Each structure stands twice: as structure tokens, then as C-alpha cells.
Amino acid sequence: MFSWVSKDARRKKEPELFQTVAEGLRQLYAQKLLPLEEHYRFHEFHSPALEDADFDNKPMVLLVGQYSTGKTTFIRHLIEQDFPGMRIGPEPTTDSFIAVMHGPTEGVVPGNALVVDPRRPFRKLNAFGNAFLNRFMCAQLPNPVLDSISIIDTPGILSGEKQRISRGYDFAAVLEWFAERVDRIILLFDAHKLDISDEFSEVIKALKNHEDKIRVVLNKADQIETQQLMRVYGALMWSLGKIINTPEVVRVYIGSFWSHPLLIPDNRKLFEAEEQDLFKDIQSLPRNAALRKLNDLIKRARLAKVHAYIISSLKKEMPNVFGKESKKKELVNNLGEIYQKIEREHQISPGDFPSLRKMQELLQTQDFSKFQALKPKLLDTVDDMLANDIARLMVMVRQEESLMPSQVVKGGAFDGTMNGPFGHGYGEGAGEGIDDVEWVVGKDKPTYDEIFYTLSPVNGKITGANAKKEMVKSKLPNTVLGKIWKLADVDKDGLLDDEEFALANHLIKVKLEGHELPADLPPHLVPPSKRRHE
């Protein structure tokens, strides 16, 4: 008796089990969020429906910049290989969107074929028409870098209204479509000719809902002197501050991202450190891909909820018979007041609402009589997903991340940053002398010995109190000096002999020169007399 009640209750109590985060996101979207989107025509206003390929695809990196800022050369530098369809030159060369992806053989897949392939995440680009699809292709090639990530090369952004109109498709809208689905957006600027055209400003503004994905690269920085570089960097930050309206400062990487010799090598160390940081950021993408997809689904769910409230409010205000057209105009003009009313009634953050101007434009062409009234059950299902299902998936995300290596992307330029004499920081700081036969501290030991014998050694060793008097002269914080003491006291007897004291001073010098201290003492820094204990 009442078996239908018990089944329903049991279904609510038992959480759904997923094998992977991607499978969980796919099922949650199809079962809980998609019905809300379809009921309130979300896809006509904001973004096409997600497909299976959107949840399974590799992390993607989108490169955006004005012409001749080095976008295609940047890809060539990363993968260390020419790719089909690649054109490089000082004039506007890349006139297409090129998805550089892994494939068993080299080749090009045209846009019209790409958008009918269910294994690719590009099917919804069909909506931008033939003018765009004729300017879209996939360059396939076997490459170890592309095993882990895909890279989207874009046409160089030009100045002037003529070029914008002659494209034949909405360039900013296409970029916005990609921005929703990629894991990283890299904006490239040329340090030698810094200029932000009107179209580029519009493009950056179109990406404003994805600031967390944006990184900026100031490329070709080896072509200018240090003083000029500082001025260019300041001008870039000032320009970006006017376009990207966020309190946080966007991360800018400075360098020269190609394999040619540096024209002005003054800032070589800076460029190496910046390249290393950017590579680490890109290498982290596969590890963080599941979290990014989860975050994007949450953002989409919040927008879908707000959209449902907007559409149902408009439906509620519409008359049943007469004066529909005049009422529609009135509602569109007063959409800002409807936003405020929804914000108050449902305690929704202003940041969750879509652009007022864009929404007004889209509503002009809609038939309000086809809008649906509020259906609380659909909203409750999405609320339940956000409150419970997403929390369970977060646990799975952390588990999947812990099983992945920290740097998944390998091959190409990424191999050049690995261990070896040309690895970043090799032979510097605590690594100095790593390949020397002699103990690297030995060359300065006579100087340290003079200080050591003024500190009243007993049986060839000084106490911690006496060592502290000398070590604090470095003005380093006690936390740092405490770490240096632990590293230098190799035999852990609470005292320092002459070699250990020399080692402590060497580590102080390393820190004062701006290098990090090692977590454990490297073998080449162990004093010669202690090496037999190792």
C-alpha cells in the first residue's frame, strides 16, 4: 500500500552515484538544469544547450589579440612544430579560427564538417552560419602537448569599422561562445607597438563574465630597453584598468615567446621567470579542468534561475487580450525596475543578472505570449542540485585532482623547463655548486671562520645563543633564521661546528639574494665531514 510514496521518498533520500565528475556533470545538467532552460527559452537568450562533448573535451586555451602580436608564433613555440593552416607574418595573416588539436595524422578538418561531428565540442557553432564556418577549421597533428590540451588560434583584431562589418559574422559573439567553454583565455599584446583598437576593447568587454580565465601576455618584450618596458607595462595596466572593470589586478606575463635569440637580453632572467610562471599555469589546466567545468555549470545554473524569474515576471505582467504590443514596449523599457523587484523578492545578487541592454535588445524580437509562468518545481530541482549534488561532486573533484600529477602537459617547450642545466633556476641560489666537485661553501669558509672563532667555540662548536647573535645581524625574520638553523645543524646536536656555521652563513646569503630556501638540505651542500653520515 502507498508503494508509490515510498519509492518517491527513497529516490529523494538516495544520492545519485557517479563514476567520474564528467559523468556527474553530464547527468545533472540533462536531468535537472536542462528542463529549466528549455521551459524558459534560455538558449534563445544566452547560450546553446550543452552536449556530451562539452563535458568530456580536453582543456582548451583561447588566444586573442590584435594582428601581428604573435598568437600563431606563440602556439608554434608551445608545441615546437608547424601545424596545418599556420601562417606567420607582420601583416594580418591568420584570417580564420583554427582549433589546434591532437590527431593521429596531420590534416585540416573544415568548419562545416567540424560542426556535425558529435565527438567535438563545436556543434553549436552552426548557429553563426556559413560566413563563420568558412573561416573555421581544425588543424590536427600528433603532438605530445596536444595530448593534454587544445589551443584555439583566432584572427588578428583589426582597427576600424570597415573590417568589423566585412567579417560577415558577429566576431565578439563567437569569442564569447568560446570563452564560455575554454579553460584559459590569453590576451596577447605587442610590447613594441602597444595599441588597443575599438574592436579589441569591445572583445575584452565581451569577455567580462570570464575574468577568472583571463591572463595577459606582453609579448615581444625583448625588442625594447628596460626603461621603455616599464613605461609600456604601465600604459598597458592603465588601459586594461579602463576596460576590465574589476578591483583585482589582471595577471600580466612579460616575455618573448618564440625560439629566436633575444634582441635585447637585459631582462633575460625576468623573461625566464615569467615564461616559467605561464607554463605552470597552462600545465595546471588538465588538473583543474573538472573544477572549471563544475564552476561553469554553477554559473550557468544561477543565470538560468534569474532568467526564469525574468521571463515569468514578464508573462505575469502581460494582458490576456488587448494592448499586448504597447505593454511589451513598456515592459522592455522598464526592465531595470523588474530586475530590482526580482532582486528584492528573491534575494539575488545584482551580479547574477544578465546585461540589461543586451536583454532589452533580445526581448524586442520575442513573442511574450509564448513565455511560461513561474514553475516552482523546476527551480526547486535546480536549488537542490546546487545545494546537494554539487557538494558531492566537489568531493569527487578533489579526489580526481589528487590522483593526477601537478604538471600533466608535457612535450614541446614544456620539456625545456624540466630538470637539467637549462631548467629554471638550475645552479642558482641553493642550487649553486650542484655540479662542482668541491664544496661550494668552501670558497667563502675562511671569511666565516674568522667570525666563528670570535664566538667562543667550546670543543670546536658554538652554542645556539652565540650563533643567534651573529645570524640576527642579517635582519632576516626569526622564522627564516629558524629554518636556516635547522638546515645547517646537520648532525642535530643543537650546536654548530665551523662547517655548519659556514653553511648557515651561505644559506643566509642565498636568502638575502632573493632565492628561496630548500625544504631539505641538498646533498651538494652537506659539509664534507658530515657526508659519511648521510
Swiss-Prot record:
Region (G2 motif): 91-92
Residue numbers spanned by region G4 motif: 219-222
Tissue distribution of the protein: Highly expressed in testis.
CDD domains (UniProt xref): EH (cd00052), EHD (cd09913)
Record's bilayer topology term: Peripheral membrane protein
Modified residues (N-acetylmethionine): M1
Entries under Pfam families matching the protein: DUF5600, Dynamin_N, EH, EHD_N
InterPro entries, A to Z: DUF5600, Dynamin_N, EF-hand-dom_pair, EF_Hand_1_Ca_BS, EF_hand_dom, EH_dom, EHD_N, G_DYNAMIN_dom
Residues that coordinate or bind Ca(2+): D489, D491, D493, E500
Domain EH as annotated: residue spans: 444-532
Subcellular location(s) of the protein: Recycling endosome membrane; Early endosome membrane; Cell membrane; Cell projection, Cilium membrane
Segments of this protein annotated with the region G5 motif: 243
Binding positions (ATP): G65, Q66, Y67, S68, T69, G70, K71, T72, K220, W258
Region (G3 motif): 153-156
Function: ATP- and membrane-binding protein that controls membrane reorganization/tubulation upon ATP hydrolysis. In vitro causes vesiculation of endocytic membranes. Acts in early endocytic membrane fusion and membrane trafficking of recycling endosomes. Recruited to endosomal membranes upon nerve growth factor stimulation, indirectly regulates neurite outgrowth. Plays a role in myoblast fusion. Involved in the unidirectional retrograde dendritic transport of endocytosed BACE1 and in efficient sorting of BACE1 to axons implicating a function in neuronal APP processing.
Subunit-structure text: Homooligomer, and heterooligomer with EHD2, EHD3 and EHD4, ATP-binding is required for heterooligomerization. Interacts (via EH domain) with MICALL1 (via NPF1 motif); the interaction is direct and recruits EHD1 to membranes. Interacts with RAB35; the interaction is indirect through MICALL1 and recruits EHD1 to membranes. Interacts (via EH domain) with PACSIN2 (via NPF motifs); regulates localization to tubular recycling endosome membranes. Interacts with PACSIN1. Interacts with RAB8A. Interacts with FER1L5 (via second C2 domain). Interacts with MYOF. Interacts with ZFYVE20.
Protein name: EH domain-containing protein 1
Organism of this sequence: Homo sapiens
